[in-house]
Structure formats: structure tokens, C-alpha cells
From Swiss-Prot:
InterPro entries: Ribosomal_bL28/bL31-like_sf, Ribosomal_bL31, Ribosomal_bL31_sf
Protein name (record): Large ribosomal subunit protein bL31
Gene this protein is translated from: rpmE
Subunit structure: Part of the 50S ribosomal subunit.
GO molecular function annotations of the record: rRNA binding; structural constituent of ribosome
Keyword S-adenosyl-L-methionine: no
Keywords annotated in UniProt: Ribonucleoprotein, Ribosomal protein, RNA-binding, rRNA-binding
PROSITE patterns reported in the protein's UniProt record: RIBOSOMAL_L31
Coiled coil: none
Any Gene Ontology biological process: translation
Length: 78
């Protein structure tokens, strides 16, 4: 078996605001700073709203500009 072909597996810190999570990874820097809290993602927390639209002005502007388009989906009659 060849030696030293596998990346180093070491402690990895995930920083979200004031919280720090520790795990293991082969990532070269040893830490990552997250600007969006993954715990507030609408897939896991329906009360949080749409995190992407709140934090990214370009996405928000796009959604405002093209909000009336259906992109092929049919709208239900009310």
C-alpha cells in the first residue's frame, strides 16, 4: 500500500455567529465562518422565512422584478 496518499484528517471548526461546532475533516484551513445560519434554513424551520432572499440583495431584486412569471407552472384559480 502506498504511504502518504491520503489527506490528513483533523479537527475542523464551523463558526456560526457566536456558536462553534467541532467535527473532523480533510479541509485544508481547519475552520469555516458561515454568514448564514444553517439552523434557520426554511427546509428545517418553516417560521424563519426565506433566508436567501433576506441576505442576498441580488436574489431579492430578481424575485421582485420577475414575481409575476409562472415559468410553466399553472396557477390555481381562486
Amino acid at each position: 500500500m502506498k504511504s502518504s496518499i491520503h489527506p490528513e484528517y483533523k479537527k475542523f471548526l464551523i463558526k456560526v455567529g457566536s456558536d462553534v461546532f467541532e467535527t473532523m475533516s480533510t479541509h485544508p484551513t481547519g475552520e469555516i465562518l458561515m454568514d448564514v445560519d444553517f439552523r434557520k434554513h426554511p427546509a428545517w424551520n418553516k417560521d424563519s422565512g426565506n433566508v436567501v432572499n433576506q441576505s442576498n440583495k441580488s436574489v431579492s431584486d430578481f424575485n421582485k422584478r420577475f414575481s409575476g412569471l409562472s415559468f410553466g407552472s399553472k396557477k390555481e384559480a381562486s
